[in-house]
C-alpha cells in the first residue's frame, strides 16, 4: 500500500464502501453498527496530542487496510460476474471477450476456389 493520505479521506472511502454494501438491503448505512463504530473511533482519535499520535496512526493504518480490502472484494465480485463462465464458450465468444475477431472463410474449412 502506498501513502495513507488523510484520515478524513480514508473515513469517506470507508463510508462510501458501506453505502455500496447496504445498497442491496435498502437500509440507510447510517443505521448500521459499522457506521457508528467508525465515526466514534475516528472522533476519539481526532486529538493531535503527542500522547495519542501513535494510536491515531495505528487506527488510520488499520482503516486504510480495511478500505483496501473492501474495495478489492467489491471489484472482484464485479469482475467475477462479468467474466464468470456459463459453461463452455465457443471460440468466437472467447475471442470477443478479449477484443479479437476470427478470420472468415467463405466456404468453411477446406474451401478451395
From Swiss-Prot:
Main localisation: mitochondrion
Pfam families (alphabetical): Complex1_LYR_2
Cell compartment(s), UniProt: Mitochondrion
Top-rank lineage group of the source organism: Eukaryota
Keywords assigned: Mitochondrion
GO CC terms of this entry: mitochondrion
Annotated GO biological process: apoptotic mitochondrial changes; dopaminergic neuron differentiation; mitochondrial proton-transporting ATP synthase complex assembly; mitochondrion organization; motor behavior; negative regulation of lipid catabolic process; regulation of type B pancreatic cell proliferation; response to toxic substance
Keyword Transmembrane set for record: no
Region (Disordered): 94-113
Similarity comment: Belongs to the FMC1 family.
Subunit description: Interacts with ATPAF2.
Function: Plays a role in the assembly/stability of the mitochondrial membrane ATP synthase (F(1)F(0) ATP synthase or Complex V).
Protein name: Protein FMC1 homolog
Native source species: Rattus norvegicus (Rat)
Gene (name only): Fmc1
Amino acid at each position: 500500500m502506498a501513502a495513507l493520505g488523510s484520515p478524513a479521506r480514508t473515513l469517506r472511502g470507508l463510508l462510501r464502501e458501506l453505502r455500496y454494501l447496504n445498497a442491496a438491503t435498502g437500509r440507510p448505512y447510517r443505521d448500521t453498527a459499522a457506521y457508528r463504530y467508525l465515526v466514534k473511533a475516528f472522533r476519539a482519535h481526532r486529538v493531535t496530542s503527542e500522547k495519542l499520535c501513535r494510536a491515531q496512526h495505528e487506527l488510520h493504518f488499520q482503516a486504510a487496510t480495511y478500505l483496501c480490502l473492501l474495495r478489492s472484494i467489491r471489484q472482484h465480485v464485479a469482475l467475477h460476474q462479468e467474466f464468470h463462465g456459463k459453461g463452455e464458450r465457443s471460440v468466437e465468444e472467447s475471442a470477443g471477450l478479449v477484443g479479437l475477431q476470427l478470420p472468415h472463410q467463405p466456404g468453411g474449412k477446406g474451401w478451395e476456389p
